[in-house]
Amino acid sequence: MVYSFKNHQTLILKQKRGNNLKNNDMFCDLETGVCGVGEEEDIQVIDFHQPKKTITLYYVTDPICSHCWAIEPVLRRLKEEYGHYFHFQTVLGGLLEKWHDGPIDPANGIYKPADVAGHWREVGEHSRMPIDGSLMIDNPVQSSYPSSRVFKVIQKHHGDEQAYTFLRRAREALFSFNQNISDIAVLIDIVNNLGLNGDVILHEAELPSGQDLLNQDFALVRDLGARGFPTIIFVNEENKGVKITGGRPLDVYIDGLKQALNTEELQPKKLPVVSALLEKEKCLFSKEIEVMYDVDQSDVRSFMEKELSQESFQLKEVLGEQYFTTST
């Protein structure tokens, strides 16, 4: 059998058998397991073309950005369905270095830590990505820089995917489970639960080199012209970009990707099965399942019970929202 791979096309030439087969070929069907005379043509042209990743998606964000937490369901589906069109790059922007006497976010009425609590709760209620926020009254996050530096150190040594997983776990801890992610002990625990050495990573994150890594992201944010969080920027190979600021519906991001690619049509990938997604994420909130699989809120529990074995997941609730975790 001869395979020729050129210009993403494959010409498959099947070897001829003996004359007694009368030009028919014998093969075993991969799906049915049945072996016999094949009905396919001897020569077929098959297109193995995969879209070339000519786009970079820059996701400008911060660990304590509540609106970034709110778009997690939409962003995950964008990556799962259309991630084969772009390279995904997280860029941290430094939302809060430290509290001071001046305004932090006057547009949202935030001048002191306690002002954050009400704003976060509103974002959580509107998005249905649960946010407690009460720690900002009695044990406020003092800075987003420590968790950002941890992200950069993990990214340096363990890659983008592991760093992004840390970012997700940190946001779960902060927003839904009310843990202070400017606390070194909390960060060490989150990193340890990823199977990494929290003490080693936190030590490096607190060195000047850790801040140097973060400063590189700050410089990129300035170059990209991002002025708020979240900002998503699609940049194509001609170095032209489409910038989308703030949390938007999925269709807006898809349209932005189409514009960057200069195409009218995209081919979405098949969505992952629920079991694989939950095993990867470890924790999924109801809203995330609704957005990923187009399920009504009232049907989420029955959907999960249908898709998963009873012993493979746990159903829990926080702030009036259901969420699902793996059993282990």
Give the residues covered by each predicted segment.
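N-terminal targeting signals for export/organelle localization
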Residues: V2-V45, S312-K316, T328
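The canonical Cys-X-X-Cys-His
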Residues: C65-C68, I232-I233
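Structural alpha/beta surface segment adjacent to cysteine/selenocysteine redox centers
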Residues: P73-F177, S286-I289
